[in-house]
Amino acid sequence: MNELIFMVEEAPEGGFVARALGESIFTEADTIAELSGKVRDAVRCHFEEGKAPKIVRLHHVREEVITV
């Protein structure tokens, strides 16, 4: 695996959550900057030495409701 994508969303209670697509990896943090470090740690813990993807992408999803 060369690349892993995380979907990042704002948590209802505040902060952010990140879920890996195709892997059972989940983490959360209060800030985006903190989340990046936690994603790195979670990926390192999930994969065996030398098996982790080379690239991790954080795909930020933000839902906004507007009236028309």
Where are these regions (language model features)?
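A short, exposed loop/beta-hairpin motif centered on an aromatic-Gly-Thr core
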Residues: E23-A33
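Short aromatic-glycine-(Arg/Gly/Cys) micro-motifs in beta-strand/loop hairpins
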Residues: V8-A20
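Short, charged, surface-exposed hinge/linker loops at domain edges
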Residues: M1-I5, A33, G37-V68
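Short acidic, gly/pro-rich beta-turn/loop elements at beta-sheet edges
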Residues: F16, E28, G37
